[in-house]
Structure formats: structure tokens, C-alpha cells
Amino acid sequence: MEIGTSLKINMIIALFLTIVSEGIFSLVIINFLKFPVIFSIIFLLILWLIQWLISPYLVERNSVEVTRDDPSYGWVYELVENVARRAGIKTPRVFLVDEPYPNAFAYGNYVTGKRIGITIPLLQILTTEELESVIGHELGHIKHNDVEIGLAIGLIPSILGFISNILLTVGWATLIFAVDEFDILVGLTMLAIGGVLFVITFFLQLFVLWFNRLRESFADYFSYELFRERAWNLAKALAKIEIYMQNIRLDPFRGIIVTIPPTKVKESDPDLLIEDLLREKTNIFSDILSTHPHPAKRIKMIYKLTKPMIF
């Protein structure tokens, strides 16, 4: 089966299972608490809308917008503009982000405008062609409305996880400072409920992360569709990012910010790292807790797509 078609089918399956699992657990909890279903749905929609509206402002802290007239970075805007034209979408607003690691991410909404954030280190380590392929990947997220979908399917696990953390924290505190049997009973009850919610959150998060990894692979495929054999530059970009980040640890649950999980590397040469990743064996557990596919899986997919053209 063609890679693009396979990715689409897998995304549909993953999204369906994610929605069904979240719906089942939500209905069980709502019925247990005797909350009206309509009220609960309205409450979730309001929370999603608030998050959708304010998230761009939270993400773009320590960033500055770049325009075509910028004397130092106008070329970055023009590069995004050219790739957007090739992708057939409106040019997003471009922001340079003051972060210590190389990264690029898509964010924004229809109110603030779709946006792309690019960190300074990424500009420093990539060639123009490599940066172009990364931008193609991010524009794929914008064209496919991945930001909105990601916020929607991640909302329920986030709420349950937040409540779970509160119950576990307060439960332990209640046990520690308990003065009678009633306090102990309350503390144990909180720990029990918090523990159950933690397990549910973890289970749901596995589905969300699975869908996120498929979205990332589809964004890689979108970059390939834009540049064909030149999409091999995306593999080189990924290798350079991995090398740069070999000593940086990032939380895979950072939410809206699209990050690239670091892996330990020995080589300083991207080509050597690519060769190692092409030989590396991976399985379903290699990236099960990551928002992005394992680097070896991404490199292998790009290699499979571009091999007939350049190798």
C-alpha cells in the first residue's frame, strides 16, 4: 500500500479509537457524578475554545514577528512565503523564538492567524534547503488543521490528569497530617480516585500520542509531496537536530509546542547518524510515550520515499 494512503487510514483508525475511548470514559465518569451530559459537553467546548484562543499568546512568549522587510531575517519570511505558495495555502505569520534548542512548530488559529515559530539555533545549523523542508513539514500541520485537532483530543486527558494530580497531592497531604480515622479515610479515598484517574489518563494519552505520531509522519509525507527528491533534506535536518540536542532532555507531554524528542548520538556527522538510524531496529515501544515517531522511523520513511529518485 502506498505510504500516504496507509498513513491516512491509520490516522482515521487512531482518531476513531481515541474519540471512542475518551467518549466511553467520559460518559462513565459523568454518569457516576450525576452530571448532565449536555452541560458537560458545553463545559468541554468552552474549555476548548478558551484554550484555542489563548494558546497562541502563551506559545509565542520570547518571540518576535518577522516580516519581508526585516533587514536580518526577511529571507526567512520569504522562504516561508515561497513554500506556502507551493503548498497552496496562505502564508502564515512567522515568528523567531528565543529558545536554546533548534525547533520549529506550527500554532495559531483563525482569529490570531496561523503562525510558524522558528528558533534561532535552527537557523544556525540548517542549510536553506534543509530549513525549507522543515517549513514544508510545519505547513503540513497548518493545512491539515493539526493544531485544532490536537487541542480537541488532548483536552479530556489533560483535564483528567489535572484532577488526578490534585487528588493524589491532597490525598497524600491529608494522610500525612491526619489527626483521626476520618482524615485517613478521606485521604485514602482521594488516593484511590486519583489513582484510577491517573490510570485512565495514561491509557487515553497512549491513544493521543499514537495519533500525534501519525500526524507527524503525515507532515513529513506532506513535505515530501512538496519537494519530492529534495525532501531528503528533511532527513538531514532531523539528523542535525538530533546531534544538537544530544544533551537536552525535553518532556514529551509539553502540549501544543511541537518538539522533537532527543536521542543519544555518538557521531557529529549527520550522514553517519543517518546511516546508523537506517540500520537501527525499532518496534512499537520505541516511541510509545513520544509525541513524535522515533527518529529512525522518520528517516526510514523519508529514505523509502526518496530512494527511487536520488539513490
Curated annotation (Swiss-Prot):
Its main location: membrane. This is Protease HtpX homolog 1. Its EC number is 3.4.24.-. It is a multi-pass membrane protein. Its cofactor is Zn(2+). Belongs to the peptidase M48B family. Keywords: Cell membrane, Hydrolase, Membrane, Metal-binding, Metalloprotease, Protease, Transmembrane, Transmembrane helix, Zinc. It is found in: Cell membrane. Gene3D superfamilies: Metalloproteases ('zincins'), catalytic domain. The active site is at E138. One of its GO terms (molecular function) is metalloendopeptidase activity. One of its GO terms (cellular component) is plasma membrane.
